[in-house]
Amino acid sequence: MPIVKVRENEPFEVALRRFKRSCEKAGVLSEIRRREYYEKPTQVRKRKQAAAVKRHMKRLNREQQRRQRPY
C-alpha cells in the first residue's frame, strides 16, 4: 500500500490527491477489482488471449491506416 507523509502546512486535500495518484500508479484499485471475485484459471487464460487478439488487431488497423493515402 502506498504511503504518503503529510508535509508541514499542507492541506489535507492535496495530500489525499497525492495518495490517490500513488495508489493509481501502484495499481491498487485495479488489483482490488481483479481479486473481488474468483476467476477460474481457464477464464483468466481466455481473457488474456482475447486481450492479446484485440491488441494485435488494433496494431494491424493502425498499420493499415498509415499505409493508406489520404486522398
Swiss-Prot record:
Positions of the UniProt region annotated as Disordered: 40-71
Q: Which domain of life is it from?
A: Bacteria
Q: Where is the composition biased (Basic and acidic residues)?
A: 60-71
GO cellular component annotations, sorted alphabetically?
ribonucleoprotein complex; ribosome
Instruction: Keywords in alphabetical order, please.
Output: Ribonucleoprotein, Ribosomal protein
GO MF, any single term:
structural constituent of ribosome
List the disulfide bonds in this chain.
Answer: none
Q: Which PROSITE patterns match?
A: RIBOSOMAL_S21
The UniProt regions of compositional bias labelled Basic residues, in chain numbering, are: 43-59
What GO terms in the biological process aspect are recorded for it? translation
Family per UniProt?
Belongs to the bacterial ribosomal protein bS21 family.
Give the protein name, as stated in the record. Small ribosomal subunit protein bS21
The scientific name of the source species is Halorhodospira halophila (strain DSM 244 / SL1) (Ectothiorhodospira halophila (strain DSM 244 / SL1))
Where is the organism placed in the taxonomic lineage, from the top? Bacteria, Pseudomonadati, Pseudomonadota, Gammaproteobacteria, Chromatiales
